[in-house]
């Protein structure tokens, strides 16, 4: 695991802003649905517990819910179609969970879960640069992510990420000075 990945993994755990699932836990292909059924402590585990059916088609995990669990839009009637969740693979790589089509409302809060498709995309880019990109392009849609009953506001999320970015910048500066 590279230093950047280690820092980013710590960020995932500390901020509770993103989902962390190992490759061994989520499986692949048709095994993914069953793998998620036994993850009670993860967001997708909670999601599966509240879904009527789970199925896989290629790299897409389809989750179908019913009743009053699912809300088509947020309280201000804006759909969460551009949300992005991240995970850490066993080998230190990253994957993105995108296409969050629908939010689920519970206890008056919005949970970023989906009865649509979750697309698992391997990420092969630098961790620090990705965090910077996430802050710049996703700040408007990162309204807070529910993982263990906690909603993290965009302000709190940015505070956590900014602290880690500052650390990365200091590490880069020290490395540059050491090379000089």
Residue ranges and their predicted role:
Residues 106-144:
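Compact, glycine/acidic-enriched structural inserts
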Residues 1-102, 164-180:
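A surface-exposed partner-binding patch
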Residues 14, 24, 70, 101, ...:
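A generic structural signal for solvent-exposed, polar alpha-helical segments
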Residues 141-180:
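Acidic, proline/glycine-rich low-complexity IDRs
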Residues 64-67, 106, 130, 147-154, ...:
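Solvent-exposed, non-transmembrane amphipathic alpha-helical segments
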Residues 81, 107-109, 153-157:
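Glycine-rich, flexible loop segments associated with nucleotide phosphate handling
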Residues 1-5, 36, 53, 120-124, ...:
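Intrinsic-disorder-associated interaction segments
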């Amino acid at each position: 695991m590279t230093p950047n990945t280690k820092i980013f993994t710590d960020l995932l755990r500390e901020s509770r802003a993103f989902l962390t699932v190992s490759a061994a836990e989520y499986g692949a292909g048709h095994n993914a649905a069953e793998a998620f059924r036994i993850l009670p402590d993860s967001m997708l585990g909670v999601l599966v517990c509240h879904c009527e059916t789970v199925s896989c088609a290629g790299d897409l995990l389809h989750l179908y819910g019913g009743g009053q669990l699912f809300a088509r839009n947020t309280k201000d009637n804006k759909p969460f179609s551009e949300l992005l969740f991240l995970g850490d693979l066993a080998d230190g790589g990253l994957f993105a969970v995108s296409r969050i089509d629908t939010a689920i409302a519970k206890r008056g809060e919005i949970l970023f879960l989906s009865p649509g498709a979750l697309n698992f995309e391997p990420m092969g880019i630098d961790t620090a640069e990705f965090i910077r990109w996430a802050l710049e392009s996703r700040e408007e849609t990162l309204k807070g992510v529910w993982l263990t009953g906690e909603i993290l506001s965009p302000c709190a999320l940015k505070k956590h990420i900014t602290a880690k970015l500052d650390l990365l910048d200091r590490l880069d500066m020290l490395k540059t000075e050491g090379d000089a």
